[in-house]
Amino acid sequence: MTPYIGRATGSNILNFGYWSEKTKDPLQAQNELCRLVGEFANLNSAKKVIDVGSGFSAPAIHWKSIYSLLNIICININLLQLKTATKLVSNTPGSDTKTLSNAKEISFVNAAATILPFVDQCVDRVVALESAQHFKSLIRFIRESKRILKRDGLLIIAIPVITTAKSLQQFMKLGILSLTWASERYKLTNIKSMIKSAGFKIIEIQYIGSHIYEPLSDYYIQNRNIIKHIILKGDSSYFRTILYDIIENIFYKSALKMKEVYQKGIIDYVLIKAH
């Protein structure tokens, strides 16, 4: 759903966003989640940060604008996204992002999350902002994170989760959302077990689903016609409009289901901090 709404907002940020009473739109919510994760990760005391599954590196750009001394390395297996991110950071033609005065301290590596190309104990933070659910496999990423983190380093994971042992069966009965949740569906208990088995100690878990699922669903439901107008603007051919209506109806039903499963306590969204 976030890439879909992102097309309407023009955002390069690939996360659900953190919504409050003051939040006006998805872009503001997405930036707020980046800010929240930066604070949760104690980036103010870090020097070298690995952003794994970095997307278009919008979180890295956001963090660098706040924590100017950070050296951020963006890891992404998607080469096309990395090339786009490079343009965004360097402000080459085709990018509308302002050049960062210290952009040279944001770098890019095309690699898998499960084989991180770094020596042992070399980084202060490993951050996976809404990306770890896509890693194959999650435990290998966690073990690699343990290997490259310094002794006082932190692993930070922001991730949507299944909340109870029975939830997976309940989730599979909820129809279309099972199809549009395009990632692994991890139970929180399993994630905690993997983190501990890799030698980490969990310091803190924040449950922020109340600021994620319902407000995002409500925004989409309330603004679906506006979003349609923006996406189809300049190209509203009959065939494209019909195709859009089919796809949009799927996302609309998914938004309703996402709100429903959160209200039933089947899913949540957590921030995990471990060392």
PLM regions with names:
Residues 176-266:
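Substrate-binding/catalytic lobe of Class I Rossmann-like enzymes that use SAM or dcSAM, i.e.
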Residues 1-18:
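N-terminal, positively charged/glycine-rich alpha-helical extensions of SAM-dependent methyltransferases
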Residues 48-115:
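Class I SAM-dependent methyltransferase SAM/SAH-binding core
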Residues 13, 28-45:
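Conserved alpha-helix/loop element of class I SAM-dependent methyltransferases that forms part
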Residues 125-137:
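A short SAM/SAH-binding and catalytic strip from SAM-dependent methyltransferases
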Residues 160-182:
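Short, glycine-/aromatic-enriched active-site segment of Class I SAM-dependent methyltransferases
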Residues 114-126:
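A short acidic, Gly/Pro-enriched loop at the edge of an enzyme's catalytic core
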Residues 139-154:
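A short glycine-rich, Lys/Arg-flanked "PGG" loop and its adjoining helix->strand segment in the class I
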